[in-house]
Design a protein with these regions (language model features):
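Tandem amphipathic alpha-helical repeat scaffolds
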Residues: 7-15, 45-59, 88-103, 129-143, ...
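Amphipathic alpha-helical segments of tetratricopeptide repeats
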Residues: 1, 27-37, 68-79, 111-123, ...
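TPR/TPR-like (Sel1-like) alpha-helical repeat modules
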Residues: 1, 7-14, 20-35, 269-285
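C-terminal structural cap/anchor segments
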Residues: 223-297
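C-terminal non-catalytic interaction modules
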Residues: 273-364
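Alpha-solenoid helical repeat architecture
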Residues: 2, 39-46, 78-89, 121-132, ...
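Alpha-solenoid helical-repeat scaffolds
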Residues: 19-25, 33-129
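Helix-turn-helix repeat elements of alpha-solenoid scaffolds
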Residues: 17-27, 57-74, 101-116, 142-155, ...
Length: 364
């Protein structure tokens, strides 16, 4: 609008021969045009980057380099232009860049800086934008094992979304994961009930509904006494082929592991051995050792159950070196081949050993 008005007035004063006024609006038109070009360039960089990040969980070195370059360019553009939109694009490009490199500490810091910037420009306030930032901060806290601040951001994010909306369910999904990773299983159960008990839950996609079924399985595994009154068909879960069978990363391995955990609890040695071997073969075919470090290590730990004939002490001793490696690795950025850890593998392993020990000499 500024450019259009400046051009019209420039033309008007040129026709009248008023040089001073002509120059005034000519300068304004030049400044406006420069700003538009800067904003257009920043929009292009952000949208091009977003299109690549949104459709993939695995980021190439080329994309990493591009994201870094765009972040630096947007910084230079915003440095000399007093434009809310341009500064906002710079922050958004930066958040995408840190997402690509998987640095959640830097992402969290940039989110905090963005919130300060938005408070200074409150006239442009959007509830959805504030909810988006709070959600992103909660996810960062999940990967940084910061339950206290994660919970605070989760509660904050929920204020900005209508109950039953897609974004509301997204917040609850991440909130559930945060609680499970912090060992707050009772709270996780409350979040689960809040989501699945909502009247809009039935309208979620099949994929999203199944994700909540998987969450329920893990919740039932860690809280069998609390959930035994609920209808959860363990045998059906063990035997059914899920929607995610075509997804060779992400949630499908999490399903296979959950099924195996229930078999271990039931003491079904034959099926345990068969399924651990199937999981090993699956891992060698579809899970990259470099990109799925924690899952690959955990599968090796599970194999010690067979190798040590389900003897708790022997299993614990044989798996100890792998547990050390697992503890030293970090749960973080999910690549396209990484498994979603609904419960940290270290916690699952502790439960397995504890329940095996309670059976005294195992199943022999």
């Amino acid at each position: 609008i500024t450019l259009l008005c400046a051009r019209m007035l420039r033309h008007h004063y040129s026709m009248m021969g008023l040089k001073q006024e002509f120059q005034q609006f000519n300068d304004l038109a030049d400044v406006s045009l420069k700003l538009i070009r800067s904003e257009t360039k920043a929009e292009h960089m952000y949208e091009q980057l977003l299109s690549q990040v949104a459709r993939s969980k695995s980021y190439s070195q080329e994309l990493t380099a591009t994201a870094k370059e765009y972040f630096n360019q947007s910084k230079e553009l915003s440095k000399y232009q007093q434009s809310f939109h341009l500064h906002l694009l710079h922050y958004r490009i930066g958040l995408l860049y840190y997402q690509v490199i998987g640095n959640y500490r830097l992402t969290l810091n940039l989110c905090n800086r963005l919130q300060v910037f938005l408070k200074k420009n409150s006239r442009y306030r959007l509830a959805s934008r504030e909810g988006e930032i709070a959600l992103l901060k909660m996810v960062c806290c999940l990967y940084l094992n910061d339950y206290k601040n994660g919970k605070q951001n989760a509660d904050e994010a929920l204020k900005f979304y209508t109950q039953g909306s897609n974004n509301w369910f997204v917040v609850l999904q991440n909130y559930f994961m945060l609680a499970m990773h912090a060992g707050k299983h009772k709270q996780a159960a409350e979040i689960f009930e809040q989501a699945t008990g909502h009247q809009r839950f039935q309208y979620l996609s099949d994929e999203k509904s199944e994700e909540w079924k998987i969450y329920e399985a893990y919740l039932h595994y860690v809280m069998p006494a609390k959930t035994k009154g609920k209808e959860f068909k363990i045998l059906k879960f063990i035997n059914e082929v899920p929607i995610y069978s075509k997804d060779k990363g992400g949630l499908y391995p999490a399903i296979l592991i959950a099924q195996l955990l229930f078999m271990i609890d039931r003491g079904d040695e034959d099926r345990i051995e068969k399924n651990i071997e199937s999981l090993r073969i699956f891992s060698s075919r579809y899970l990259s050792g470099k990109k799925s470090v924690r899952t690959s290590i955990f599968i090796k730990m599970l194999r010690q159950l067979i190798n040590c004939h389900f003897k708790p002490e022997k299993v614990k001793a044989k798996a100890a070196p792998y547990l050390k490696k697992l503890t030293e690795s970090k749960y973080g950025h999910l690549t396209e081949n990484e498994t979603m850890e609904i419960i940290p593998y270290e916690d699952i392993w502790s439960i397995i050993l504890s329940r095996m020990t309670s059976k005294k000499q195992g199943w022999n």
